[in-house]
Amino acid sequence: MRYLVLGSEGQIGKPLVEYLRAGGHCVEEYDYQRDPQEDLRHLDQPVQSKIFLNKLKNCDFIFFLAFDVGGSKYLSKKEAEFDFLHNNISLMKNTFELIREYNKPFIFTSTQMSDMTHSSYGNAKLIGEKYTSSLNGLHVKLWNVYGPEFDIAEERCHVITDFVRSAKNSACINMRTSGREKRQFLYVEDCCEALVTLSNIYNSVDRSEQLHISSFEWTSIEQVARIISNIYSCEYTKGQEKDVVQLNLQYEPDKNILKYWQPKTSLLDGIRKICSHYN
């Protein structure tokens, strides 16, 4: 199958490209980080439009991962700003219009935060879900996917990568919060497997089902810090900031996805894999 991965340089996009190619698939990459002309925000411009349409016309399936996003540090600073909202609404509007015109099958990656009405990021992803449903595509809610992150601004790092970098480079992990807030963390390879599995059964998946891609295990941020500090034999400290991104909300994910796929990588094993990438 010929796949087009939108956001192919991202935390999930890059491993997904590798996963697909390892499976013998043809993959077209698209990301403004690899080419400034590959910018979904500006598909109304001739050069950008031509590049995108050449890739779109020649693919069999699209993974729509592209989004202006980062970890909690980034979201807490940026998600209420005009540029954050405008970037994401623009890229969705342009991309969904052309997906509709060329009638391509696709999966849009949303987030569990689309159920959190206080979140601008979650609301933007919710709009993407609505677009997707209107085109009879598939959208999935990703739960705190983690994996190695390279060539990324520090403010965009996700919490596990941020802690690993701090432990390795500074011999200390300084948490921003008390660490009591809990998340469900999923290793990126498991996420890639879930996405490809869904692409293979795309036409038979019930569109009324909620598809949450998660480990289905709650872990506190302090537990993550403790695991990483034990690996690097360093200390960790607690912070005073509040969880302004998710407000300590804990929605339980729907488990419909488990009919098609199951997570394999434990949190400890996943963290060890990340550490090995940085050592």
Regions found by a protein language model. Name each.
Residues 3-22:
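N-terminal Rossmann NAD(P)H-binding glycine-rich loop of SDR-like oxidoreductase domains
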Residues 7, 17, 167-279:
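C-terminal substrate-binding subdomain of Rossmann-fold SDR/epimerase-dehydratase oxidoreductases
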Residues 28-51:
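Adenosine-cofactor binding site in Rossmann-like domains, unifying the SAM/SAH pocket
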Residues 49-87:
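NAD(P)H-binding glycine-rich loop region in Rossmannoid oxidoreductase-like domains
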Residues 61-64, 90-123, 138:
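Conserved Rossmann-fold NAD(P)-dependent oxidoreductase catalytic core, especially the SDR/UDP-sugar
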Residues 87-94, 105, 127-128, 187-190:
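Conserved cofactor-binding/catalytic machinery of classical short-chain dehydrogenase/reductase
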Residues 91-99, 131-132, 194, 198:
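Hydrophobic positions on the long internal alpha-helix
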Residues 118-122, 126, 130-183, 188-196, ...:
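NAD(P)-dependent short-chain dehydrogenase/reductase
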